[in-house]
């Protein structure tokens, strides 16, 4: 039986620590050395992909065994996307990274020099095999009558969202809110800044990652609304039931494109590069795209997307290009002393 996705913080932290230690221990040997009958990969991923990669890893292991006669085990490490990127830069031996946004893999390429700067061009769709967007999860009956972004800045509203300094999903949340404010009559950078400032005044706690915020909202019962990845909100309905929560689709959201990459320096040293490349490539296969859709991420493959069209409502979406790309957005909003720091300063 699959464990509940809203595991308590301490239990979850202990599990992740054990996984990381196990993976680091495994990295002491050349996992993919010629003649190996078993190979081990470490996938360092962002917070709410546990269920997706639990299913995908099993499928890829079957595929690789059938094609190559070799057993493969994929270990997972999960956390806020920015925090995970920092762990890889600081030495966590990831063969692949599957993070929440391109800026975090850019940081690994620039600061860690662990993969090429053109990593995004090495796989289809800018190395983003699935997409998502940002929605609201509210309690059944929507008792606070939350319908759009403007409601989240009302006095007395309790909004749950993670910390953009550590969480990729939180940065998508922030930018979606900013985009809505810009789209309002007379909207401009000053009015967007003021709106987002009021919204974050209503946030009682900033968890480090999206799954932590989900736990805060659904298990601890804090908050009136959770700003969430669409897949995370849909998972909550599946796991906990539509009798407890419901999803509200805002009038404007953002196209979130979580990227993936092989960490070349690590994979070459460990002899796992061929398997790591195949692993990420299999995300684009029909089976991979089916698993993606079943786990509530929006698939890239047109035929698979058509089969799941009723699962994913159409939304007005801005893109990161509307913010000048991730390098510009990161520098303006999320760098030390950036807009987020300014509007949340005491």
Task: Name every feature range the model reports, one short phrase each.
Residues 267-346:
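Extracellular/periplasmic juxtamembrane helices and adjacent flexible linkers that interface
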Residues 134-142, 257-274, 291-295:
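A bilobed periplasmic-binding-protein/Venus flytrap-type ligand-binding module shared by bacterial periplasmic
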Residues 141-147, 166, 179-187, 266-274:
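Short helix-loop capping/hinge motifs at secondary-structure junctions, enriched
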């Amino acid at each position: 039986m699959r464990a509940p996705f809203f595991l308590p913080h301490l239990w979850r932290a202990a599990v992740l620590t054990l996984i990381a230690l196990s993976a680091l221990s495994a990295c002491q040997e050349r996992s993919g050395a010629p003649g190996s009958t078993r190979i081990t990969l470490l996938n360092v991923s962002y917070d709410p992909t546990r269920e997706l990669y639990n299913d995908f890893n099993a499928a890829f292991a079957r595929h690789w065994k059938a094609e190559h006669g070799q057993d493969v085990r994929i270990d997972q490490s999960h956390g806020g996307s920015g925090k995970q990127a920092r762990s890889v830069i600081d030495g966590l031996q990831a063969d692949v990274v599957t993070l929440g946004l391109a800026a975090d893999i850019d940081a690994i390429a620039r600061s860690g020099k662990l993969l090429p700067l053109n990593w995004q061009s090495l796989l289809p769709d800018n190395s983003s095999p699935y997409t998502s967007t940002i929605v609201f999860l509210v309690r059944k009956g929507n008792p606070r009558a939350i319908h759009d972004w403007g409601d989240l800045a009302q006095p007395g509203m309790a909004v749950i969202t993670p910390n953009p300094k550590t969480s990729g999903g939180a940065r998508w949340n922030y930018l979606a809110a900013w985009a809505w404010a810009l789209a309002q009559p007379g909207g401009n950078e000053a009015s967007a800044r003021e709106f987002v400032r009021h919204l974050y005044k209503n946030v009682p706690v900033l968890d480090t990652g999206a799954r932590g915020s989900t736990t805060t909202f659904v298990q601890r019962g804090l908050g009136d609304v959770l700003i969430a990845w669409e897949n995370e909100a849909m998972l909550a309905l599946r796991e906990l039931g539509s009798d407890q929560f419901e999803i509200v689709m805002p009038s404007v959201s953002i196209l979130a494109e979580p990227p993936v990459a092989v960490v070349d320096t690590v994979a070459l040293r460990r002899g796992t590069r061929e398997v790591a490349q195949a692993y990420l490539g299999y995300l684009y296969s029909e089976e991979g795209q089916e698993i993606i859709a079943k786990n509530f991420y929006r698939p890239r493959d047109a035929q698979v997307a058509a089969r799941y069209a009723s699962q994913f409502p159409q939304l007005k979406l801005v893109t990161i290009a509307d913010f000048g790309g991730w390098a510009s957005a990161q520098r303006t909003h999320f760098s030390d002393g950036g807009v987020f720091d300014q509007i949340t300063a005491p």
